[in-house]
Amino acid sequence: MTARGGRAPLARRAVVYGAVGLAAIAGVAMWSGAGRHGGTGASGEPPDASAARGPAAAPPQAAVPASTSLPPSLAGSSAPRLPLDAGGHLAKARAVRDFFDYCLTAQSDLSAAGLDAFVMREIAAQLDGTVAQAEALDVWHRYRAYLDALAKLRDAGAVDKSDLGALQLALDQRASIAYRWLGDWSQPFFGAEQWRQRYDLARLKIAQDPALTDAQKAERLAALEQQMPADERAAQQRVDRQRAAIDQIAQLQKSGATPDAMRAQLTQTLGPEAAARVAQMQQDDASWQRRYADYAAQRAQIESAGLSPQDRDAQIAALRQRVFTKPGEAVRAASLDRGAGSAR
């Protein structure tokens, strides 16, 4: 995140959330955060890249009501719904990992034991008294073991992205660890993104092979693309359009285009509905920045009032809830607060 409210560049968010509506661009860049727990999915992807896609992804489901007592980092949010199969058992779907990754967002607020207790409560809130409750707890403990194993890797599993051999070894190692601890859950948790990582790595190997001419590289890349499943190929085409739209929005912002001019340009390439959503996002973004600045000023007054840490945190949490009333806003503000605290 960047300064001034810590927001991601509007160009990217406008496309991801407003214009094209895709999962964010996947690729080998995901390796830069390998092995981290907090703030990312377990694969080390950025938050906006951890959206499920591919055959292992479960369709979106409504969230369940938030627990009565949520950690500060999750205040105002609701846990994703745990999916069940026709027999009432926990469904082997990516949505289960999404639920656990949601819970892991709170690990900066909780001890290891506290995090386990929180996950148990969140599972019970949905599955209390069912066979799926014990199944979900078992998968949680296995997932924690997987994360702990990743954390024990050298440099937490991070590798030099320019070293394709190291990338290949890291991918194989992470897949092995996932299967060792998660067994048949490793496929719904990581199968789609592991496939994508291997595909992207194969593309890099071709592109960087000094023994190939440009024509040979193009031929091999085209052949590799033909091996891609139809749904992945369609997703890649959408990603390509997303990249082009991101570049266009960034150029318009850089040139100082007015909102009306930007909307007119985007209408030509993205269509009127998408252009209208980008314009609305600009307005929402400006409103957010004003409200966050006002909130930050009030938060600073609380921080300088000489309160005990417990009273200070309680007053700041209450302030967040008063100022940020829309779903997810309080969570976003808390995340920005933590980032600001780390920078100080």
From Swiss-Prot:
Localization terms from the record: Cell inner membrane
Renumbered residue ranges of the record's region Disordered: 37-78
GO biological process: lipid catabolic process; protein folding
GO molecular function annotation: unfolded protein binding
Chain segments annotated as coiled-coil in the UniProt record: none
Biased composition (Low complexity): 43-78
Keywords: Cell inner membrane, Cell membrane, Chaperone, Lipid degradation, Lipid metabolism, Membrane, Transmembrane, Transmembrane helix
InterPro entries per UniProt: Lipase_chaperone (IPR004961)
Membrane topology label: Single-pass membrane protein
Transmembrane segments: 14-34
GO CC field: plasma membrane
Entry keyword annotation includes Lipid metabolism: yes
Chief subcellular location: membrane
Superkingdom of source: Bacteria
NCBIfam families linked: PRK01294.1-1 (NF002333)
Family as reported in the entry's similarity comment: Belongs to the lipase chaperone family.
Cross-referenced HAMAP family: Lipase_chap (MF_00790)
Function: May be involved in the folding of the extracellular lipase during its passage through the periplasm.
Name listed for the protein in its UniProt record: Lipase chaperone
Species whose genome carries this gene: Burkholderia cepacia (Pseudomonas cepacia)
